[in-house]
């Protein structure tokens, strides 16, 4: 058997190496009995692209009768009709297989197969350099792909980390918001508790600062405790002078009453905002005209019978409340004291008549004028105690609200501490406090200022101007003027003490009766000396009242001198 063998190797533009081997055996056909051309084609394709496995295609086909006639000559004695049918079948199979072959082969495959191509076969064979180049390109592409993969993985991890961070931030924000809400709730609870404490302290302050009803001292058999007095509703006491007769209070009982009143004053906490007590609340004080003038009034009154004394014993005690235990106790004490002192008055009535007859009319007029002067001074002092009537106080600031309770605590611990020392301690404590500790007191200040504004919408703060006094042609400050008047009062008192012996500030009925039991001449001498002492004391009281009133009046006269107070 004779064969024709050829090999085709080429590299097309799409970087594919194709190798075609054609082996054409020439053998007689068994069916036809004549020679037949059988073409065996091996096709090898090597792909340079990554991930593509080379594909080997092997196809067997029978060539057409024309190509077979060119390559070999027919042999045998086959009939012509069978040969034509076979040729038709071959042409059909070749025509069906050619489109598939043309996809893998170039246009000049026939020329290359027949050896008519001008290009040498050595140009189409693959070399080692081209293979190394292609391997290098493949390695570079693999390296680039691994780098891209790493970048994608890092970006994915960064995105995942960013999402985790955002989630953590959201959780932190939620925790902060919850903590803030809890802190706000705690602060609100603390504010409510502090407001409750402030309200409780205000109630305690109002209970402590309620005015006390001063009761005259009674004998030990009929003492009245002050506990039921605090439980009862306290009614306002009018500040009007009430005439208390001398027989009501014994000298020893008066001393006890003054001591008890002082003890009550010191035991009470200091109240800077409270008004000074009126003179009628202290019946034992030496400044009230009724007690000081009662001996002379009894001398000038003429006859005094039991009916008039009983009328004086029934004092107007309606302001204490009718049916009150205190009122009943006072009335019983007055009746007891009146019963003890009625018999000596009847015995000494004649001596009083003789004493009044012996006194000159001028002394009686002086005594009455002194009585009116002291009454006017009492009214002036009451006006001063009333803070000039229409004066409106400023609302308390935060420091005053805080210092009110702290001052009370310090006074309870140290009752004898001076007010200036307490103020220094409170000022240093207030400066050392933080803003959070001061906050409730500032809120209380705002509440008080709003309340003050609602109560007095037209209020305007008008501070007192600094004033000076012109005394004997010299301009003096108010403090210097007060010191000068104090020295003058001391001089007048020292002169009075040298001229006449000292006497008690208040006269009792028993001391006067003891003096009247002596001779009438000695009584005259004692009455004159008592009038002298009273005149000196009244002059001192006049100076004190003028000193007190120096801030409110434009001009004050002292010892015949014109004193002008200027701004």
UniProtKB/Swiss-Prot annotation:
Molecular function as annotated in GO:
DNA-binding transcription factor activity, RNA polymerase II-specific; RNA polymerase II cis-regulatory region sequence-specific DNA binding; sequence-specific DNA binding
Give start and end residues of each DNA-binding region. 392-460
Query: Which cellular components does GO assign to this protein?
Result: nucleus
Which body tissues produce this protein?
Expression is highest in the ovary, with weak expression in other adult tissues.
Under SUPFAM superfamilies, the record lists: HMG-box (SSF47095)
Subcellular location(s): the record lists: Nucleus
Keywords annotated in UniProt:
DNA-binding, Nucleus, Transcription, Transcription regulation
Asked if the record carries the keyword Ligase, the reply is: no
The superkingdom of the source organism is: Eukaryota
UniProt cross-references to PROSITE patterns, sorted A to Z: HMG_BOX_2
| A biological process term (GO) from this entry | regulation of transcription by RNA polymerase II
* Region Disordered, residue ranges: 66-86, 249-307, 490-513
This protein's major location comes to: nucleus
What is the annotated role of this protein in its UniProt record? Answer: Transcription factor that binds to DNA at the consensus sequence 5'-AACAAT-3'.
Q: How does it assemble?
A: Homodimer.
What name does the UniProt record give this protein? Transcription factor Sox-13
Encoded by which gene?
Answer: sox13
């Amino acid at each position: 058997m004779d064969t024709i063998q050829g090999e085709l190797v080429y590299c097309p533009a799409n970087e594919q190496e194709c190798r075609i081997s054609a082996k054409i055996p020439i053998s007689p056909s068994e069916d036809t009995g004549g020679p037949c051309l059988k073409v065996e084609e091996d096709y090898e394709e090597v792909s340079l692209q990554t991930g593509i496995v080379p594909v080997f295609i092997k196809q067997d086909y029978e060539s057409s009768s024309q190509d077979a006639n060119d390559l070999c000559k027919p042999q045998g004695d086959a009939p012509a009709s069978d040969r034509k049918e076979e040729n038709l079948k071959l042409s059909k199979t070749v025509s069906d297989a050619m489109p598939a072959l043309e996809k893998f082969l170039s246009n000049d495959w026939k020329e290359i197969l027949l050896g008519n191509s001008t290009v040498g076969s050595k140009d189409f064979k693959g070399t080692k350099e081209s293979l190394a180049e292609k391997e290098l390109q493949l390695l570079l592409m693999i390296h680039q792909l691994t780098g891209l993969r790493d970048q994608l993985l890092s970006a994915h991890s960064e995105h995942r980390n960013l999402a985790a961070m955002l989630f953590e931030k959201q959780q932190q924000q939620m925790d902060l918001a919850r903590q803030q809400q809890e802190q706000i709730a705690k602060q609100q609870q603390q504010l409510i508790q502090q407001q409750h404490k402030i309200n409780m302290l205000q109630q305690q302050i109002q209970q402590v600062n309620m005015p006390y009803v001063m009761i005259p001292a009674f004998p030990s058999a009929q003492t009245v405790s002050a506990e039921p007095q605090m439980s009862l509703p306290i009614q306002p006491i009018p500040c009007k002078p009430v005439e208390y007769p001398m027989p009501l209070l014994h000298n020893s009982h008066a001393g006890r009453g003054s001591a008890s009143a002082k003890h009550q004053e010191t035991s009470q906490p200091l109240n800077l905002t409270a008004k000074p007590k009126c003179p009628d609340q202290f019946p034992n004080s030496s400044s009230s005209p009724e007690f000081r003038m009662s001996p002379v009034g009894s001398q000038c009154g003429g006859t005094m019978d039991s009916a008039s004394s009983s009328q004086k014993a029934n004092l107007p005690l309606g302001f204490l409340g009718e049916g009150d235990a205190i009122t009943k106790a006072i009335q019983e004490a007055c009746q007891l004291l009146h019963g003890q002192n009625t018999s000596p008055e009847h015995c000494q009535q004649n001596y009083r008549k003789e004493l009044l007859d012996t006194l000159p009319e001028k002394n009686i007029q002086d005594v009455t004028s002194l009585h009116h002067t002291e009454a006017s001074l009492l009214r002036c002092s009451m006006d001063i105690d009333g803070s000039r009537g229409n004066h409106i106080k400023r609302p308390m600031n935060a420091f005053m609200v805080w210092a009110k309770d702290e001052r009370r605590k310090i006074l309870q611990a140290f009752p004898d501490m001076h007010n200036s020392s307490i103020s220094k301690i409170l000022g240093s404590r207030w400066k050392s406090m933080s803003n959070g500790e001061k906050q409730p007191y500032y809120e209380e200040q705002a509440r008080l200022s709003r309340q003050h504004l609602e109560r007095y919408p037209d209020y305007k703060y008008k501070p007192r101007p600094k004033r000076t006094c012109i005394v004997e042609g010299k301009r003096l400050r108010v403090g210097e003027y007060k010191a000068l008047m104090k020295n003058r009062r001391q001089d007048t008192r020292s002169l009075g003490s040298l001229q006449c012996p000292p006497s008690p500030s208040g006269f009792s009925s028993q001391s006067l009766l003891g003096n009247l039991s002596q001779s009438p001449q000695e009584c005259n001498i004692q009455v004159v000396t008592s009038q002298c002492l009273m005149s000196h004391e009244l002059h001192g009281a006049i100076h004190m009242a003028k000193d007190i009133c120096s801030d409110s009046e434009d001009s004050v006269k002292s010892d015949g001198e014109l004193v002008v107070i200027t701004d």
